[in-house]
């Protein structure tokens, strides 16, 4: 079944409109006036729900809620026997009509309830729920079904009989409900059975497909084992041929070396630099001979592409590129363990090299090159067959030879399975079988991947492609090489160490950690390295502008693609571990030249502008003043900056001394002008009155102006009271200076002003400052009471 279709069809307009009509039907039958329409309720439920099941369950709750209201109304009407009879004889109940079920008589059979009663809720395999159920379980609906004539008689006795008869009536209602539910469950069960049959057929088809895939995989595994057996037989044949060739070669080399030793003992040792041995022509001709032999030998048809074994219970066949498990278990004989599993010919690394003059390798190399070519001609057909099978089959081979066996193994760098294009290993790129004389250069194919180890061990040569292989006892990582000199250990000439005779590889042995940084061709690697470093140094001027450009467009969503390109360019320029070919670096230079104008726009480098006559000398200072003139601390900053300089130039400012004797004398006169009667009265005032002299008035004629404030925690804050006390007080009463505009702020202050004015009219003609202040406090209190 299409599960995705079920997940999306509930959002369709037709499905939602269907549920809206059901909600509206339930509301109409319940007879409840609601502020929201059925469409508003459905929209609220649709926004709240996240899945189909949640949406259907919320709609079902809403419909059940309205049906419960309808059932309560119908039960309330049952209390009247006559209304109950009329409602029952009139037709089916609203709940039964909503579900769409016909009424059932008392004689209808209730058989099969036990078997179908277990089908509680409909399974999710069916498409949409029936419109009456709205996705809910059938037993969760409160449905009032039709009553039989037997229940009509029971309803007539409800008002007259006991509670036990009411329970019997409820049981009969439940029986009618079960009949309706049974029919619904039968319909749902039939739909579920058809859906389950379709699903079962799909599962059976999938199982048949899986069985076919497993049979194909088993057939491929059998073919793989047969290929392994053929390869092992070929290895045994090669082993026998190599043993015969090595025995003949040992005998001939023993005789030749004895003659050379006798002839060279009379000559003084010639000092030659061991690191600069020329390559003789016989060793150079070996790769061409082997390549010609590989082309002329018989070509085996490539075996069928091997697919990795897949477990039988695997549901789908994985592609070969994603399988990283080895094809052959360790219990089986790996093809990498070729040639010699028993080491009969080993060499003793005795320190007898001191007695041997440095001229021997060159002479020995010329004599052994022809013999090695003959051995390679006999061994090459078997090697051709093995390498073709390995290269085309994509097998995983790893060398397991000890470094002192007579013939070395496959490269120590394991060939990855399925991740490198193995079809690139052509017949002409097969590894050579040759004697690793000290000056010999071994050509390795370009298509071999670099080994995973970044730096070789001391006993191994460099693992770069096209690198010269030193004559150490360890096998070359990417070629078939016999061990140096297959003679027995009793001959002192053959015990050579790689320290005396070796050819330097073009690249250093301590290669970088990143395997992708291994430089390619050997002849021009040093020149390209120097050219690469010069180009990188030349492009270093773009690093800072590129960083500023990246920071500028980092938050710009429209230029995400340009941002990723700029970041990759910056990584190439700044990260030394990320090496790239010189051509790539030249392309980066072209891209940076195109971006040069964009990068120079936001932050151009300050050009050296010569001072012209039009530019004002203090223009930067004026610009800074204009930029900060609105700052609140600007005046302080100017004072702190320029006052020390101005003081140093002009000296301290000249100011006259301040004479304050006259002012002090005026204050004494004012204090003496305040009458002592007024001073005593103010001192005896209530603490809630705060009295001060008005500093804005001068008492030329002896009149004292006072400002009084009301500080009472029980009264609100009001404007201060201004009094004018005459000089002959208490003979004359103090005057209130009416500031009416202060009381026009709000209605409360206006009420205070009215109360104060009316109370002042009630005071006697002669009154004191204390009486005036008390009247003021009473006016505020009265205004508070009137406002409350």
Swiss-Prot record:
Residues 260-269, 285-294, 309-329, 426-446, 460-482 have a biased composition (Low complexity). It comes from Homo sapiens. Its main location: cytoplasm. This is Mediator of RNA polymerase II transcription subunit 15. Residues 9-73 are annotated as: Interaction with SREBF1. The modification Asymmetric dimethylarginine is found at residue 349. Induction: By 12-O-tetradecanoylphorbol-13-acetate (TPA). The gene is MED15. Keywords: Activator, Cytoplasm, Methylation, Nucleus, Phosphoprotein, Transcription, Transcription regulation, Ubl conjugation. It comes from the Eukaryota. Belongs to the Mediator complex subunit 15 family. Gene3D superfamilies: Coactivator CBP, KIX domain. It holds the Pfam family Med15_N. Expressed in all tissues examined, including heart, brain, lung, spleen, thymus, pancreas, blood leukocyte and placenta. However, the level of expression varied, with highest expression in the placenta and peripheral blood and lowest in the pancreas and kidney. Component of the Mediator complex, which is composed of MED1, MED4, MED6, MED7, MED8, MED9, MED10, MED11, MED12, MED13, MED13L, MED14, MED15, MED16, MED17, MED18, MED19, MED20, MED21, MED22, MED23, MED24, MED25, MED26, MED27, MED29, MED30, MED31, CCNC, CDK8 and CDC2L6/CDK11. The MED12, MED13, CCNC and CDK8 subunits form a distinct module termed the CDK8 module. Mediator containing the CDK8 module is less active than Mediator lacking this module in supporting transcriptional activation.
